Design a protein with these regions (language model features):
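Metabolite-binding pocket within alpha/beta catalytic cores that recognizes anionic/polar moieties
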Residues: 1-124
Length: 124
């Protein structure tokens, strides 16, 4: 069934997704893939699918914030995506972190409503 926000369905047959916030970043991700198919854009959700090292991968923007990302992840789950990586940019307070340095977050300050629906209070 076509999902109401991302406008994709199970026929896409993809298990892996890379999720930037910005639609232009979805295009940039797709530029590293072969056999790219532009699936279009609905609201903040820019979707392109392609192949990378033998895997079929969806690059789809989520917009900013937890609510739009939550919608994206739930609808992707509904169409069979089992692995998703959210990527993006951030600021740093530590002076030893250089611009452009790769960071992998182990936790986050949560002061929103969306994450409370998924994990208990106090979880990183």
């Amino acid at each position: 069934m076509k999902q109401p926000h991302i406008q994709l369905d199970e026929s896409l047959n993809v298990r892996y997704a890379i999720l930037p916030g910005d639609p232009k970043r979805a295009e940039r991700i797709a530029s590293h893939m072969s056999e790219v198919e532009d699936l279009g854009m609905n609201r903040e959700y820019r979707s392109l699918v392609g192949a990378y090292r033998g895997a079929r991968i969806l690059a789809m923007s989520t917009g900013m914030g937890g609510v739009s990302t939550g919608i994206a992840v739930e609808e992707l789950h509904n169409i069979g995506v089992t692995h998703a990586i959210r990527i993006g940019s951030c600021g740093a307070l530590q002076t030893d972190i250089a611009p452009g340095e790769l960071l992998i977050a182990a936790g986050a300050v949560r002061d929103d409503g969306t994450s409370r629906a998924y994990v208990r209070e106090g979880y990183p």
